[in-house]
Design a protein with these regions (language model features):
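Recognition helix of helix-turn-helix/homeodomain-like DNA-binding domains
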Residues: 36-52
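Short basic helix-loop element that most often maps to the first helix and adjoining turn
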Residues: 15-34, 59
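DNA major-groove recognition helix of helix-turn-helix/homeodomain DNA-binding modules
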Residues: 55-71
Length: 87
């Protein structure tokens, strides 16, 4: 099994997370404060060094004022899995 951390789809998810943060006009420092994390942790997640689990993703999005379900729908519309990419 390959690691999804390195897939195009995961990179698209990270890019969308960055867009959501910048659209909300929230810096990495401010997001870190809202999450009670460090700015380095936020940066590591946004660059793919550290993986977010689904619970962390939900908390992250809530801190920015977004719902997980809406984020997943948006991600799915811009990065659909091809049949041969399904896990």
């Amino acid at each position: 099994m390959y690691k999804t951390l390195y897939t195009r789809e995961y990179q698209q998810m990270l890019a969308l997370l960055r867009v959501k943060r910048t659209d909300a006009q929230v810096s990495q420092v401010e997001l870190a404060r809202r999450l009670a994390w460090t700015q380095a942790d936020v940066s590591k997640c946004e660059t793919g060094v550290r993986r977010l689990d689904v619970i962390e993703l939900r908390i992250w999005l809530k801190a920015l004022g977004y719902e997980l379900a809406d984020f997943v729908r948006e991600l799915d519309s811009c990065a659909p899995l091809l049949p041969d990419q399904a896990l």
